[in-house]
Amino acid sequence: MPSSTFLNLAPEKQEKLLSAAVREFTERPYNEASINRIVREAGIPRGSFYMYFRDKEDLFRYLVQESIQELLVVFEEILRGRNGDVFAALPDMYDYLRSHPAADCGLGGPGMMSAIVNRNGGLQKGGLLEFVEPELILERMEDCVNPDLLDLREPEDLGY
């Protein structure tokens, strides 16, 4: 995760580095992505990069988690619009994702995740899931899901 030094940077400086990283990770597979290209495009010294993130994986993890958070916000809005009906919300979420193609690779945008998955075939098989904390997602969804619309036998059946 980013250091406090990074979080204290001016937003435009953060955006510059993150935009360069998004471009790098969406244009190349993770194992070919280069910190040198990222810092060159962002216009920062390589040493500064290491003051902000431990390594390439740390930056990649941050980008993926930020993108997932953005998608959760969208899903929460869809769920609320569907009165907490998960099964009615899923097709809407699918439509949302299809309407935001991989070309929409802005920071945290759904296209970013799509492009990263497409560039990293090995990650599709669950590698990205290691960056996700399911219990936090479930906690966040708790207020949005209407349990009365589900066939729950125990409160724990929802996962929290």
What are these regions (language model features)?
Residues M1-R28, N36-R37, E41:
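Basic, helix-initiating cap at the start of DNA-binding domains
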Residues E27-Y30, M51:
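Helix-turn-helix/winged-helix DNA-binding modules
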Residues G43-Y52:
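Short hydrophobic/aromatic patch on the recognition helix
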Residues F53, V64:
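DNA major-groove recognition helix of helix-turn-helix
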Residues D55-F60:
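Short amphipathic alpha-helical segment with a characteristic S/N-K-E followed by hydrophobic residues
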Residues Y62, E77-A103:
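Hydrophobic alpha-helical connector segments
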Residues Q65-L72, E76:
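Short, basic, alpha-helical segments at the C-terminal edge of helix-turn-helix-like DNA-binding modules
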Residues Q69, A88, V117-Y160:
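Amphipathic alpha-helical packing segments from all-alpha helical-bundle domains
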